[in-house]
Curated annotation (Swiss-Prot):
Any one GO molecular function term: structural constituent of ribosome
Quaternary state and interactors: Part of the 50S ribosomal subunit; part of the 5S rRNA/L5/L18/L25 subcomplex. Contacts the 5S rRNA. Binds to the 5S rRNA independently of L5 and L18.
Any one Gene Ontology BP term: translation
Gene: rplY
Function: This is one of the proteins that binds to the 5S RNA in the ribosome where it forms part of the central protuberance.
Keywords: Ribonucleoprotein, Ribosomal protein, RNA-binding, rRNA-binding
SUPFAM superfamilies per UniProt: Ribosomal protein L25-like
PANTHER family for this protein: RIBOSOMAL PROTEIN L25/GLN-TRNA SYNTHETASE, ANTI-CODON-BINDING DOMAIN-CONTAINING PROTEIN, RIBOSOMAL PROTEIN L25_GLN-TRNA SYNTHETASE, ANTI-CODON-BINDING DOMAIN-CONTAINING PROTEIN
Family listed: Belongs to the bacterial ribosomal protein bL25 family. CTC subfamily.
Organism placement in taxonomy: Bacteria, Pseudomonadati, Pseudomonadota, Alphaproteobacteria, Hyphomicrobiales
Name of protein: Large ribosomal subunit protein bL25
CDD domains: Ribosomal_L25_TL5_CTC
Length: 208
């Protein structure tokens, strides 16, 4: 889990496109805090802080504290909008949470040991089916990423959720099927059976 942080914010007295454009001209981004059966709270946060938090990674899996006047509100960033042309943030949605909250969150998938994966060393291609996995997790213990070790995968293998060790109290939202996260695809012009034969030959040679 990434380290929590604090964002300073100001209440927005006005909402709408005109007000939002004015905020952005002055270095702020319009945002809203919602959830926990409370009325939505319209706020403005620093453009620079949000920009760096988003592009540093882990933005939507890290709990933050928003300081608004005398209030300190624990939140989880749930969504953000980017300018369609220039890719800078223009709006953020925050969900109210507590230390006891359990939330649905998209956790990124990270693959490691590509350099030792048998399938990739033989020219196979890592075909990522899911870059993120929708999970249910405690708000105060959301993992930064789901780590998958590729060192034992060969060409033709599939990586399913059932073989992934998730952190304690983290479960996938999808429970009715063993969905695929990634596969090791054969390179163009190669059949999976060719690689299987080569693997068997390697094993036989190792025994002699």
């Amino acid at each position: 889990m990434s380290k929590s942080y604090t964002l300073k914010a100001e209440l927005r007295e006005r909402v709408g496109k005109g007000s939002s454009r004015e905020l952005r001209r002055n270095g702020f981004i319009p945002a809203v805090i919602y959830g926990d059966k409370q009325p939505p709270l319209a706020i403005a946060v620093s453009y620079k802080e949000i920009f760096y938090k988003i592009y540093a990674g882990g933005f939507r899996t890290t709990v933050a504290t928003i300081a608004v006047g005398q209030q300190k509100i624990m939140v989880l960033p749930k969504d953000y909008q980017l300018d369609p042309v220039r890719d800078f943030p223009i709006h953020v949605d925050f969900l109210r949470v507590s230390a006891q909250s359990v939330v649905e969150v998209s956790i990124p998938v990270h693959f490691f040991n590509e350099d030792t994966a048998p399938g990739l060393k033989k020219g196979g291609v890592l075909n990522i089916v899911r870059h993120e996995i929708e999970c249910i997790a405690p708000a105060n213990a959301i993992p930064e990423a789901i780590e998958i070790d590729l060192s034992n995968y060969s060409i033709g293998d599939s990586i399913h959720i059932s073989v992934v060790k998730l952190p304690k109290d983290v479960t996938p939202v999808i429970q009715d099927r063993d969905f695929t996260i990634a596969t090791i695809a054969a390179p163009a012009g190669m059949n999976v059976s060719d690689d299987s034969s080569e693997q068997e030959s390697d094993k036989d040679n190792a025994k002699t």
